[in-house]
């Protein structure tokens, strides 16, 4: 269950962050409406991923995903845009990921 859940979180992050990045590139960086359209499709696909999480609680899944989004956004920025996080960015992302573990995988 944990592996499936973690993989779904990664897929959700790639779709959401990637989709938002494509929209950004298409609109703000003037790369064209095809980029924007691809971003919208990726964002739409992201909307379905949470439904496949093993946990049945929507609020829990989306709250935990928020932590993955924070860390994933920093990683995406590093890879795609040359962003260099500082120690506070990294510390904040680590705190968020700890929150993911507590919210999703703590014994209940």
From Swiss-Prot:
Broad class of the protein's primary localization: membrane
Gene Ontology CC terms, in alphabetical order: plasma membrane
Transmembrane segments: 7-27, 32-52, 61-81, 87-107
UniProt keywords, alphabetically: Cell membrane, Membrane, Transmembrane, Transmembrane helix
Top-rank taxon, per record: Bacteria
Subcellular location: Cell membrane
Membrane topology: Multi-pass membrane protein
SUPFAM superfamilies found in the cross-reference section: Multidrug resistance efflux transporter EmrE
Family the UniProt entry places it in: Belongs to the UPF0060 family.
HAMAP family linked: UPF0060
NCBIfam families: PRK02237.1 (NF002586)
Protein name, per record: UPF0060 membrane protein Mflv_3127
Organism this protein belongs to: Mycolicibacterium gilvum (strain PYR-GCK)
Source taxonomy: Bacteria, Bacillati, Actinomycetota, Actinomycetes, Mycobacteriales
